[in-house]
Amino acid sequence: MNKLGDLSCKEFLTELASAAPAPGGGGGAAMAGALAAALASMVANLTIGKEKFADRESEVKELLEQAEAERVRLLTLVDEDAAVFNSFMSCYKLPKTTDEEKAARTAAIRAAAKQAATVPLNIARSSFAVLKLADRLVVSGNPGVITDGACSGLLARAALRCAEYNVRINLGLTKDEAWNAQAAADLKQLLADAEALETRLLAVTDKALQ
């Protein structure tokens, strides 16, 4: 089977809509984040090389490089999310006849749950990185595509929120209270920072449209 990140839009949506549980919400979140990164790249590409934006070319080139890196990372995370979900589900098929088998199965489920929470946590972090780029691009990018920058930010925050729920659903299965507390704290900070960034970039965009 082809990597999910290599499928056409139509093929990916068909996979997402199928009865198979993966790709699911996590993969959809990663793809939304990748779309946000692509929009950020578009804004940067429509700014670079234009004489009237020469004073910010160096900055925008750096933002473009970062956006492209996040796009690649998020596409990779589409596949990683499906892989860890499938691995997690396979743990429930492990034998559970003897006490030793039951203990090994329980340990495998907990370890797989932690991986199933780690990948969407990485999706959330990467989506937040894209949101930060969008926040800068609505200021430094070509004003003719400022709304595309805003759309990048909105998609990135939506991707982060979707990833959040995919983290939370797995936390109760890890049985690692310290790890869960750190993951929850990381998410809380990301969400608070993302809300502030989105508010700011939308205010900049709305002002430009007046």
Which ranges hold each PLM region?
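Short, hydrophobic/aliphatic alpha-helical segments
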Residues: 4-23
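Preference for long, well-ordered alpha-helical segments
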Residues: 130-133, 145-205
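Amphipathic alpha-helical coiled-coil segments
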Residues: 67-74, 120, 127, 187-190, ...
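Accessory "access/gating" subregions that flank catalytic or transport cores
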Residues: 2-7, 198-210
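Conserved phosphate/anionic-ligand binding catalytic regions in large, soluble enzymes, centered on
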Residues: 18-41, 145-163
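Transmembrane signal-anchor/signal-peptide helices with a preference for the extracytoplasmic
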Residues: 42-54
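A structural-propensity feature for long, helix-poor, extended segments
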Residues: 51-90, 197
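Amphipathic alpha-helical interface segments
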Residues: 81, 85-154, 158, 170
